[in-house]
């Protein structure tokens, strides 16, 4: 394929990407915040709107999901310091990590146990609100817990929701939609874990399985919705609502950092490492963080060596016009949540001027990191959620990047946040298998 040869000449890093080697890519198209935000299709108002909507729904969430009672129906996760893991990383990789290391435990988000509880649940709630307002079931001034009634469930049962997923988005959309009363179908790709399918079916969700990858599952979900006017399709590749649901995480994180007395400013940079599949979750979170911290936050996406779709799309500038399969990469990885061959064009183009860089990590490395985190901090994440954990090691080793960004002298006063995207709902026997694999790879 001649085009690929041309791309290889233009982007030499592509050779390593094709060889599924671990790479670190600095985004040459990143702009200063004030420039980037001018051309952005989304802004602060959009994120505020999403935040307000989640507040309106909080009484309903607290009522139907008792695990959110303590937080009054706000779906949020802990931010924890992980000093023992930091020491282990420094020792294992022989690389000092300057600054403090924290883990954002979206793995322990209530309801669906992953970052997808942010965007997925938000989009379903927004759709439910629109229908309920349109048909006079609700006004914005109401206590939204009135939606927990047979009348409302019967009303929502006349509508359906569809989504294509590798697993975690399906869990959040499926659980939330079924709770409201919608008929919900999750189209799942070949790499979706069995326990995720079983859990969804136990909640009354219709699960359709495919032998093909994520893109096919999304395509089929879209087709189902197109054929049925009462069916709403959650489009993980193009959804602004999902993106905004994730972006709300930033203001929540800001409060947590303030509670921990962690300063973020020009002298105290913040580095955030986000596992990336199709791009919605990390894209939304990164966008929200840039709105708050502007040029003082540096966001990096992390992808499996066998599914580096966003890195490929950003580096070549082709976005969703190129898939990893086009350059001979198989898109087969144990990091099921990140097993995506073609990135979201909407996310890639939106986040491009805000993103600091992107790197890849091997499955073997994910398992080793999984075991290490379990041993040092007693925190258990699923393999894909560990993709961010190697980020601080990689960034601290990038002297050229740090000097160029005038960060070298500031690193000691900086903060690194690894976004732990999922894991608390993994069945014990499955998690034990992951741990064992990590152990075998270390021995």
UniProtKB/Swiss-Prot annotation:
The modification N6-(pyridoxal phosphate)lysine is found at residue 116. CDD domains: D-Ser-dehyd. Its cofactor is pyridoxal 5'-phosphate. The keyword Lyase applies. Its EC number is 4.3.1.18. One of its GO terms (molecular function) is hydro-lyase activity. InterPro entries: D_Ser_am_lyase (IPR011780), Ser/Thr_Dehydratase (IPR050147), Ser/Thr_deHydtase_PyrdxlP-BS (IPR000634), TrpB-like_PALP (IPR001926), TrpB-like_PALP_sf (IPR036052). Keywords: Lyase, Pyridoxal phosphate. GO terms for biological process: D-serine catabolic process; isoleucine biosynthetic process. The keyword Lyase applies. It catalyses: D-serine = pyruvate + NH4(+). It is an enzyme of class 4 (lyase). Belongs to the serine/threonine dehydratase family. DsdA subfamily. This is Probable D-serine dehydratase. The lineage of its organism: Bacteria, Bacillati, Bacillota, Bacilli, Bacillales.
């Amino acid at each position: 394929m001649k085009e690929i040869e041309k791309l290889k000449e233009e982007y030499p890093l592509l050779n390593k990407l094709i060889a599924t080697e671990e790479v670190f890519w600095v985004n040459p198209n990143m702009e200063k915040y004030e420039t980037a935000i001018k051309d952005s299709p989304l802004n602060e108002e959009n994120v505020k709107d999403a935040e307000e909507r989640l507040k309106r729904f909080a009484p309903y969430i607290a009522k139907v999901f008792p695990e959110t009672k303590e937080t009054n129906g706000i779906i949020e996760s802990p931010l924890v310091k992980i000093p023992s893991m930091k020491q282990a990383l420094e020792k294992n990789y022989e690389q000092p990590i300057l600054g403090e290391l924290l883990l954002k435990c979206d793995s322990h988000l209530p309801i669906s146990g992953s970052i997808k509880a942010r965007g997925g649940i938000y989009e379903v709630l927004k759709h439910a609100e629109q229908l309920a307002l349109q048909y006079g079931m609700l006004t914005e001034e109401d206590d939204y817990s009135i939606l927990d009634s047979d009348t409302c469930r019967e009303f929502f049962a006349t509508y359906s929701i569809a989504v294509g997923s590798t697993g975690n988005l399906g869990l959040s959309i499926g659980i939330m939609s079924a709770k409201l009363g919608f008929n919900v179908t999750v189209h799942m790709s070949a790499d979706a874990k069995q326990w995720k399918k079983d859990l969804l079916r136990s909640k009354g969700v219709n699960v359709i399985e495919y032998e093909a990858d994520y893109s096919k599952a999304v395509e089929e979900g879209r087709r189902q919705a197109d054929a049925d006017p009462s069916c709403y399709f959650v489009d993980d590749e193009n959804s602004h609502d999902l993106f905004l649901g994730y972006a709300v995480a930033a203001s929540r994180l800001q409060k947590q950092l303030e509670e921990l007395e962690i300063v973020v400013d020009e002298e105290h940079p913040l580095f955030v490492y986000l596992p990336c599949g199709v791009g919605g979750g990390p894209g939304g979170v990164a966008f929200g963080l840039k709105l708050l911290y502007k040029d003082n936050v540096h966001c990096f996406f992390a992808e499996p060596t066998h599914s580096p779709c966003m890195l490929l799309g950003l580096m070549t500038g082709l976005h969703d016009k190129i898939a990893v399969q086009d350059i001979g990469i198989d898109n087969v990885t144990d990091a099921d949540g990140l097993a995506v061959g073609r990135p979201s064009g909407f996310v890639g183009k939106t986040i491009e001027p805000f993103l600091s860089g992107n790197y890849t990590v091997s499955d073997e490395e994910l398992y080793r990191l999984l075991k290490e985190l379990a041993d040092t901090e007693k925190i258990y994440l699923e393999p894909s959620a560990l993709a961010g954990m190697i980020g601080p090691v990689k960034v601290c080793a990038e002297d050229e990047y740090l000097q160029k960004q005038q960060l070298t002298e500031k690193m000691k006063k900086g903060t690194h946040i690894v976004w732990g995207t999922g894991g608390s709902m993994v069945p014990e026997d499955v998690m034990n298998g992951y741990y064992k694999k990590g152990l075998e790879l270390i021995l």
